[in-house]
Amino acid sequence: MLDIKWIRENAGVLDNALAKRGAEPLSASLIALDERRRTVLQSLQEMQSRRNAASKEIGAAMAQKNSELAEKLKAEVAELKDALPAAEEESRRMEAELTDILSRIPNVPLEDVPVGPDESGNVVKRLVGSKPTWNHKPLEHFEIGEGLGFMDFEGAARIAGSRFTILKGQLARLERALGQFMLDLHTQEHGYIEVQPPLLVRDDAMYGTGQLPKFAEDLFRTTDGRWLIPTAEVPLTNMVREQILEGEKLPLRFTALTPCFRSEAGSAGRDTRGMLRQHQFNKVELVSLTDAETSVDEHERMTACAEEVLKRLGLHYRVMTLCTGDMGFGARKTYDLEVWLPGQDAYREISSCSVCGDFQARRMNARYRSKEEKGTKFVHTLNGSGVAVGRALIAVIENYLNEDGSVSVPEVLVPYMGGLRRVEKAA
């Protein structure tokens, strides 16, 4: 969430940022609403101050045996007490109205983010590796998985409906191996702390990371009002909610392997076959909490950590800098890692790494204290996929497909597969 004081002082900057995101200017209406709010608040505070002063004056008048003045003051206090509830309610209403509008305004992009309307404006930052060259025909992951007998979409549909998958046998083991490999890499080499967070969270947690109130339709809600997490970013980032951290201990880096749940409300007709777009999928998440001075560098570091997964798996990919029109609601800058899928003859997103500045921290009231400075500041938050496990499985089986329909196991995963080097058709 943006700071209304910052908006008052940077109205043109906000409107320019909104224009880059394809949104209408809002600064004038926000500042006008804030002026009304502050006028109401000032009036309320003056009423409260006068009530308190008059109450003290009653005692002084009584001590001086000035009953006429005392009665007059009592009447004034009574009148103020009667008027205060309505004034307090009006102040709360205007505060809530302003907060609601602010909570729906996207973050301000960094200056070096390319301007564009949608994914067509994204820019290739770098290409890593090269596309595989084979003599045999590439296949899509669902053709390979069903051919091996380890991927069952019809069975999943009978149990849960569309956009679910049953993995069995060696493909289930391969997906588990991928997740374990990623966690080991991030915890043992990249300095992240492994966390097993709740998969159900409250409204305020979803609000803190920016999923609510704007994106409720993309989420699954339980009958008791909790939400299934769409990403472990939500619980990991909210671990510092309402906390004051010691600045000397920053950055904090957390990682988790969790199921993620998304309704895919806006994805009708897209990727209806296979595992690319599921209601439930596994993902390794990376979250960093740092300060303003180091958050941009931390973004580069986090992206490199996610890239290392793909490098060690021997996968060809590209890094995309997302443009203003394709960036997420809470992000100031985002890099997407897009892995090459031979079966689709296309690059597909497998990781998204974003720096959010203090946007989420303001919503969570997450701050830090430095020994060198007085007071507290909001932390800066970052999140990224390190990486999506299901999509990594897709990439591995499409890129490591053999002519006989079997799939070679990437060398880095062999120890996690008990020495198995090839996934072959179920007997």
Swiss-Prot record:
Binding locations of ATP: R262, S263, E264, E349, I350, S351, S352
Coiled coil: none
Alphabetic keyword roster: Aminoacyl-tRNA synthetase, ATP-binding, Cytoplasm, Ligase, Nucleotide-binding, Protein biosynthesis
Keyword Aminoacyl-tRNA synthetase carried by entry: yes
A GO term for molecular function: serine-tRNA ligase activity
CDD domains assigned: SerRS_core
PANTHER family, sorted: SERINE--TRNA LIGASE, SERYL-TRNA SYNTHETASE
Record text about domains: Consists of two distinct domains, a catalytic core and a N-terminal extension that is involved in tRNA binding.
Similarity annotation: Belongs to the class-II aminoacyl-tRNA synthetase family. Type-1 seryl-tRNA synthetase subfamily.
Subunit structure: Homodimer. The tRNA molecule binds across the dimer.
Protein's name in the database: Serine--tRNA ligase
Organism for this UniProt entry: Sinorhizobium fredii (strain NBRC 101917 / NGR234)
Lineage start: Bacteria, Pseudomonadati, Pseudomonadota, Alphaproteobacteria, Hyphomicrobiales
